[in-house]
């Protein structure tokens, strides 16, 4: 924009770098009296930057100079002469501070606004469970719900149940696992984060197989299976699937109903779990349980984690150990974890073979789901048919 305060100011561009203020004044002085000649120079070298500003006392003289001198040659270079606008360097100096302050205020506003905005999203899961919004003000939002998970009255009863079975089973794997399972239980305390739970299983399989006790899996499965126990109290849908299929055999319902029953009953979760947690971590558990007995071969498979089929073949290879010894150990430890004293009583009645069968079929189901329906004898097909039919299960 034309400088209103200096209407007689002209911009002269395209100057020869040798042109100085004196030559400019001599050239433009013939149009009128010049009040100022400003040749822009480089600060460091003090050389001309090739443009200048000349201010005439009379705007009319300035217009005449523009009319006559624009495009003319000065010191061998064609120059541009025009009415001066707010110079870029001035507006640049003035502008950036404004924009910077604007940006800063925006940034502060964003930080101030975004801060509060972001925490609710992080605290959202906690709010799902009815936790107080004060979590939003604290940095450690996720851990706090976990710590406060057990208190919610809904689950106040079930966690002890969980603790009872998981305690004995986990005693072999160490106290750290006990710590983790309570955290998991805490997550059970509210409904939102269980949606976040499936990711931990995917990490857990490796932890589990590494630790040998795969207690994180216990944490997860105790979450899952004990919630099946809770499901008996307030989640009829698992029962509908499992009891319809298997009859009311408590311990056996317990293990299949929630963890493996999820695979059988809930189609979507079945595939998901069979591919990931069950494919990797339920199988890894078998390996880690079989490992104490003689699953050194079974230890190898965890890396092949994703492909249920290959893993299943390896299970067939080490099935005497992983499914035999490990299966008993697994069914013993694992089903004790999941079904607690009830399972132990049932196992005493039924004897180990059925606990074996109890521990074993679910993975078979998951493997057969992965597309490898390798006939494993009557036990495998029988167990699957029992799962499907329900009559076979109710026999026990």
UniProtKB/Swiss-Prot annotation:
PROSITE patterns given for it? RRM
Keyword Phosphoprotein in record: yes
Chain ranges of the RRM domain: 8-86
Q: Offer an example of a GO molecular function term for this protein.
A: chromatin binding
Post-translational modification N6-acetyllysine, affected residues: 30
Phosphoserine occurs at which residues?
91, 335, 355
| Disordered as annotated region, ranges | 84-396
Localization of this protein = Nucleus
Where in the sequence is Omega-N-methylarginine found? 122, 141, 162, 170
InterPro entries membership? Nucleotide-bd_a/b_plait_sf, RBD_domain_sf, RBM, RBM1CTR, RRM_dom, RRM_dom_euk
Instruction: One GO cellular component term, please give it.
Output: catalytic step 2 spliceosome
Q: Gly residues bias: where? A: 323-332
Q: How is it modified after translation?
A: O-glycosylated.
Query: What GO biological process terms does the UniProt entry carry, in alphabetical order?
Result: cellular response to interleukin-1; membrane protein ectodomain proteolysis; mRNA processing; negative regulation of mRNA splicing, via spliceosome; positive regulation of mRNA splicing, via spliceosome; positive regulation of transcription by RNA polymerase II; protein homooligomerization; regulation of alternative mRNA splicing, via spliceosome
Per the record, the covalent cross-link Glycyl lysine isopeptide (Lys-Gly) (interchain with G-Cter in SUMO2) lies at 22, 80, 86
Q: Which residues carry this modification: N-acetylvaline?
A: 2
Q: Which parts of this chain are annotated as the region Necessary for RNA-binding?
A: 336-396
Which residue ranges have biased composition labelled Pro residues?
148-162
Q: What is its main location?
A: nucleus
Q: How does it assemble?
A: Homomultimer. Found in the supraspliceosome complex. Identified in the spliceosome C complex. Forms a complex with ILF2, ILF3, YLPM1, KHDRBS1, NCOA5 and PPP1CA. Interacts with CLK2, KHDRBS2, KHDRBS3, SAFB/SAFB1, TRA2B and YTHDC1. Interacts with ERAP1; the interaction is RNA-independent.
Q: What's the entry's take on its domains?
A: The RRM domain is necessary for RNA-binding, but not for splice site selection, indicating that its splicing activity does not require direct binding to RNA.
Give a short account of what the protein does: RNA-binding protein that plays several role in the regulation of pre- and post-transcriptional processes. Implicated in tissue-specific regulation of gene transcription and alternative splicing of several pre-mRNAs. Binds to and stimulates transcription from the tumor suppressor TXNIP gene promoter; may thus be involved in tumor suppression. When associated with SAFB, binds to and stimulates transcription from the SREBF1 promoter. Associates with nascent mRNAs transcribed by RNA polymerase II. Component of the supraspliceosome complex that regulates pre-mRNA alternative splice site selection.
Name of the protein: RNA-binding motif protein, X chromosome
Gene name of the encoded protein = RBMX
């Amino acid at each position: 924009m034309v400088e209103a305060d200096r209407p007689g100011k002209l911009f002269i561009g395209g100057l020869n770098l040798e042109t100085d203020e004196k030559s400019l004044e001599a050239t433009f002085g013939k149009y009128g009296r010049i009040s100022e000649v400003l040749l822009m120079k480089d600060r460091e070298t003090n050389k001309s930057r090739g443009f200048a500003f000349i201010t005439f006392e009379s705007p009319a003289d300035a217009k005449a100079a523009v009319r006559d001198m624009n495009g003319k040659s000065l010191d061998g270079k064609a120059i541009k002469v025009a009415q001066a606008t707010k110079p870029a360097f001035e507006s640049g100096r003035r502008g950036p501070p404004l924009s910077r302050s604007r940006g800063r205020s925006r940034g502060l506003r964003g930080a101030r606004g975004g801060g509060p905005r972001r925490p609710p999203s992080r605290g959202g899961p906690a709010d799902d469970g009815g936790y107080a919004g004060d979590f939003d003000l604290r940095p450690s939002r996720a851990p706090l719900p976990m710590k406060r998970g057990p208190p919610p009255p809904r689950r106040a009863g079930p966690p002890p149940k969980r603790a009872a079975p998981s305690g004995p089973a986990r005693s072999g794997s160490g106290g750290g696992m006990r710590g983790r399972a309570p955290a998991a239980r805490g997550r059970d305390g509210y409904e939102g984060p269980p949606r976040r739970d499936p990711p931990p299983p995917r990490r857990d399989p490796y932890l589990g197989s590494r630790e040998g006790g795969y207690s994180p899996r216990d944490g997860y499965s105790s979450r899952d299976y004990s919630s099946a126990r809770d499901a008996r109290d307030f989640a009829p849908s698992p029962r509908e699937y499992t009891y319809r299929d298997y009859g009311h055999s408590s311990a056996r319902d317990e293990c299949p109903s929630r963890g493996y029953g999820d695979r059988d009953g809930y189609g979507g979760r079945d595939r998901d779990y069979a591919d990931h947690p069950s494919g990797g971590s339920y199988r890894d558990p078998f390996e880690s349980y079989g490992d104490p007995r003689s699953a050194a071969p079974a230890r190898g498979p965890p890396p092949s984690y994703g492909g249920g089929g290959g893993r299943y073949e390896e299970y067939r290879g080490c099935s005497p150990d992983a499914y035999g010894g490990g299966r008993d150990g697994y069914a013993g430890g694992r089903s004790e974890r999941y079904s607690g004293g009830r399972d132990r009583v049932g196992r005493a009645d039924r004897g180990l073979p059925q606990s074996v069968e109890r521990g074993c079929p679910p993975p078979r189901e998951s493997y057969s789901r992965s597309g490898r329906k390798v006939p494993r004898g009557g036990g495998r097909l029988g167990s699957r048919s029992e799962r499907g039919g329900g009559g076979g299960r109710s026999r026990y």
